[in-house]
Design a protein with these regions (language model features):
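Membrane-interface helix/loop boundary segments of multi-pass membrane proteins
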Residues: 124-147, 176-183
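Hydrophobic alpha-helical transmembrane segments
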Residues: 8-12, 40-41, 70-74, 111-115, ...
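Active-site His/Glu-centered metal-binding helix of metallohydrolases
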Residues: 123-128, 132-133, 154, 158, ...
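Juxtamembrane helix-loop-helix connectors linking adjacent transmembrane helices
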Residues: 32, 58-121
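Alpha-helical transmembrane segments in multi-pass membrane proteins
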Residues: 5-55
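Structural signal for the C-terminal ends of transmembrane alpha-helices
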Residues: 51-60, 177-180
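Functionally important transmembrane alpha-helices
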Residues: 21-24, 146, 161-203
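Interfacial transmembrane-helix boundary/kink motif in multi-pass membrane proteins
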Residues: 1-15, 40-41, 56-86, 137-143
């Protein structure tokens, strides 16, 4: 039964990754200035349904943050900021994700891009990486945390070893937040807050 549940979670996680991504691209064709409200509503609805399904089958764990979890969120977020500052002091980070971000912002910021980067993408990534992979499949083990963080880094398409370790550190911190809290909203809020920081430079 345990193996069936893990296969079920793995299949569902892949399905969410494929469907949500394909739905978003089919709406705007990669142009965040097109069909903005439709893009936001459809992706939000798909993620909402995904969370409901996963919660129904006990694949993920989330709820209102306790005081301890709130402190964990604040501490993890501050640590990610410090790691980011320290890492960029010694290394340059280059990746496909970073290049895509620069290309999207070169023509200005659209509402759908802002919502995608700061809300939808963090929710989707935390749902798949921390909720499904680390939690449901690897049962929140330390090995699962490390493997999931490595996959998280790889899928951000780093161009070199320092860039790989940059995203790996981020994945490890997010994974640690979920492992210690057993609440997916903790790592998701950290991810949202961190992704919001670069956009402040455009204000």
């Amino acid at each position: 039964m345990a193996i069936f549940n893990k296969c079920h979670a793995l299949f569902f996680g892949f399905l969410v990754f494929a469907i949500v991504g394909a739905a978003g691209y089919s709406i705007n064709q990669g142009d965040y200035f097109q069909h903005q409200y439709t893009f936001i509503v459809v992706k939000s609805l798909l993620l909402f349904l995904s969370f409901g399904y996963a919660k129904w089958f006990d694949m993920i764990s989330f709820g209102i943050l306790s005081k301890k979890q709130l402190l964990l969120f604040i501490g993890t977020f501050l640590l990610t900021v410090l790691v980011n500052i320290g890492y960029h002091t010694f290394f340059s980070v280059s990746s496909g994700a970073a290049i895509q971000h620069l290309e999207e912002t070169s023509n200005g910021l659209s509402l759908s891009f802002i919502v995608s980067v700061t809300v939808l993408a963090p929710i989707q990534e935390e749902f798949i990486f921390r909720g499904i992979l680390q939690g449901a499949i690897f049962e929140n083990s330390w090995l699962g945390l490390g493997l999931t963080a490595s996959l998280f880094s790889f899928l951000h398409a780093p161009y070199d070893v320092p860039s790989f370790f940059y995203y790996l550190l981020g994945g490890l911190l997010l994974g640690f937040a979920y492992k210690k809290s057993q609440n997916l909203w903790v790592s998701t809020l950290v991810h949202m807050s961190y992704n919001s920081l670069p956009l402040l430079t455009y204000l």
